[in-house]
Amino acid sequence: MEPFVVLVLCLSFMLLFSLWRQSCRRRKLPPGPTPLPIIGNMLQIDVKDICKSFTNFSKVYGPVFTVYFGMNPIVVFHGYEAVKEALIDNGEEFSGRGNSPISQRITKGLGIISSNGKRWKEIRRFSLTTLRNFGMGKRSIEDRVQEEAHCLVEELRKTKASPCDPTFILGCAPCNVICSVVFQKRFDYKDQNFLTLMKRFNENFRILNSPWIQVCNNFPLLIDCFPGTHNKVLKNVALTRSYIREKVKEHQASLDVNNPRDFIDCFLIKMEQEKDNQKSEFNIENLVGTVADLFVAGTETTSTTLRYGLLLLLKHPEVTAKVQEEIDHVIGRHRSPCMQDRSHMPYTDAVVHEIQRYSDLVPTGVPHAVTTDTKFRNYLIPKGTTIMALLTSVLHDDKEFPNPNIFDPGHFLDKNGNFKKSDYFMPFSAGKRICAGEGLARMELFLFLTTILQNFNLKSVDDLKNLNTTAVTKGIVSLPPSYQICFIPV
């Protein structure tokens, strides 16, 4: 048989199989736009603004609908009621992690972000307990954040009130907090190892949110068969994990089980306690994966929110003035802010919440997956199906947040000026997969922002009317536009 004929027959078979497979799946899944063979709905989705495409689909198909990325169905939840019903009311069924081919190559299912089942539950529980309840050594995590806030202020003083792009400095601070938590000590901002770590994290963050990675996730054959920036990501990950392994070996050589210094020590002690359990998830590979995940989850996300926050405060000097007035009243100028201050600073608390709501860092949320065949609103979602909860549809709900596209701390204040909680506040997602670093991130945002505003006035280089605060959407994240700022010592 001629090779050309064989090729045509193979392609025809693949096409027919794709059509049959999609037809069988679609019968029980929520409705959605009709997918094309092999490529699914990719031509109907704007990869530069996925949320806009999904919002348009929700207007046609309702709050629960199905789209196809390639041949893989993704069930999307739009609006508070649908997101809450899935992630909170049916939390166990929707607690899986929807892993893309790229993330599988990177994590191999290890650590805390991309793991599932028993491994995820045990590693997550241990990490939460360690981060939340245990001040490692003689220093609490709050002490470490306060130390970094002080160092951040000193770095900002070095700008001498000249215009600067705050991206690098604001990236160093959260990364150094993670270094302090996992490696025991922080780094100088000019330390070469620290700068190398920062470079790799920044590079991977940029590449992973590029359209090329979305294409690779939809057509996994490209990952192994074609050159591209995804190979740079995999190389950076390998080098970072090698560095973490070196640090783990140093910790093993100096470990004192009665005096744990940091997260790595705590994990090594847990490994020793479970050394006779052959099925234990506490091993070196999961330790390396978990430490890497702490950096991934705790560096770029917090630094981007800080950067967006300063831009919004720059744009709204009346808000900045009220925060500084509250700082003067509650904290003063001669001691460092602490977390106990937050309950006495309702306006500042509201501002931090509004920064997170408005910045809407991960509009689509990190993908989930159903852990079992799940019936949801008369639809049957097969086990393993990827789920997307559109957090942006909750954070921008106009019934809960009047004028949701306007930055307004009043969204989190009652008529008496007291802080007002909202069930719609989901920047960290919700349910069983809510971000494990939520507590640390909240602490960093409050302490970093209050410490900066305690020590500096903010000045824009441009006319405030021309200062753009509209997010730049890249991949699954929203980033603030670039800007210059002057930190004027108080």
Curated annotation (Swiss-Prot):
Effect upon mutating R186G: In allele CYP2C8*8; increases affinity for paclitaxel; reduces enzymatic activity with paclitaxel as substrate; decreases intrinsic clearance of paclitaxel; reduces enzymatic activity with amodiaquine as substrate; decreases intrinsic clearance of amodiaquine
Enzyme Commission number(s) from the entry: 1.14.14.1
Bilayer topology: Peripheral membrane protein
GO CC annotations, alphabetized: cytoplasm; endoplasmic reticulum membrane; intracellular membrane-bounded organelle; plasma membrane
Outcome after substituting R139K: In allele CYP2C8*3; reduces enzymatic activity with paclitaxel as substrate; decreases intrinsic clearance of paclitaxel; reduces enzymatic activity with amodiaquine as substrate
Pathway where it operates: Steroid metabolism; Lipid metabolism; arachidonate metabolism; Cofactor metabolism; retinol metabolism
Catalytic activity: an organic molecule + reduced [NADPH--hemoprotein reductase] + O2 = an alcohol + oxidized [NADPH--hemoprotein reductase] + H2O + H(+); (5Z,8Z,11Z,14Z)-eicosatetraenoate + reduced [NADPH--hemoprotein reductase] + O2 = (11R,12S)-epoxy-(5Z,8Z,14Z)-eicosatrienoate + oxidized [NADPH--hemoprotein reductase] + H2O + H(+); (5Z,8Z,11Z,14Z)-eicosatetraenoate + reduced [NADPH--hemoprotein reductase] + O2 = (11S,12R)-epoxy-(5Z,8Z,14Z)-eicosatrienoate + oxidized [NADPH--hemoprotein reductase] + H2O + H(+); (5Z,8Z,11Z,14Z)-eicosatetraenoate + reduced [NADPH--hemoprotein reductase] + O2 = (14R,15S)-epoxy-(5Z,8Z,11Z)-eicosatrienoate + oxidized [NADPH--hemoprotein reductase] + H2O + H(+)
Coiled-coil region: none
Residues annotated for substrate binding in this entry: S100, N204, R241
Protein family per UniProt: Belongs to the cytochrome P450 family.
Protein name, per record: Cytochrome P450 2C8
Organism, as annotated: Homo sapiens
Gene giving rise to this polypeptide: CYP2C8
